[in-house]
């Protein structure tokens, strides 16, 4: 009984729900900012989420085809305002790699049409299962210095893509790009 009474007044949480309750109380008493509280909640929540929960689905992907000429794909790249693009072969399940928009700058800056080789420009695509937990994925992004991963289902078919920005937005909220 003495231990129970001591625990009652110790002020230390014994589990995550108690911790969240204490943090909520601290925010209500203005000891921490609401934005900080939301980030803490987000950071704790990412370990419960999976790549499938936040990925850009297959149907919404903006891709470049391996055999396309720059004149054919540049308008799409510019209009989309994305910085990375999956490069496909025959279909969306045949991902050859990732094309970075910054690697296309010489094509945009030179009206004469700089020499471009898709094969030399694409980078290997990181591949993750739909079930990958976001906290693990974030660590892999950091460790491998990747910003985008191809998400595949249990049959190895493309489900979508997920970016480091998608994961970070789960922690800090919406990130507005210019």
Please provide the spans of the model-predicted regions.
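Short, low-complexity N-terminal regulatory "tails/caps" that precede and couple sensory modules
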Residues: 1-13
């Amino acid at each position: 009984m003495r231990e129970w009474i001591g625990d009652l007044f110790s002020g230390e949480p014994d589990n995550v729900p108690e911790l969240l309750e204490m943090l909520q109380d601290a925010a209500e008493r203005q000891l921490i900012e609401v934005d900080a509280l939301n980030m803490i909640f987000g950071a704790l929540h990412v370990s419960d989420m999976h790549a499938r929960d936040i990925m850009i689905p297959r149907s919404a992907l903006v891709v470049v085809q391996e055999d396309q000429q720059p004149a054919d794909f540049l308008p799409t790249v510019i209009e989309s305002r994305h910085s990375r693009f999956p490069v496909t072969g025959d279909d969306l399940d045949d991902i050859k790699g990732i094309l970075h928009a910054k690697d296309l700058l010489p094509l945009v800056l030179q009206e004469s049409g700089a020499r471009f080789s898709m094969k030399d420009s694409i980078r290997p695509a990181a591949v993750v299962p739909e079930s990958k937990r976001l906290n693990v994925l974030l660590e892999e992004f950091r460790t491998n210095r990747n910003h985008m991963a191809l998400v595949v289902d249990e049959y190895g078919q493309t489900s979508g893509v997920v970016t480091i920005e998608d994961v970070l937005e789960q922690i800090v909220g919406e990130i507005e790009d210019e």
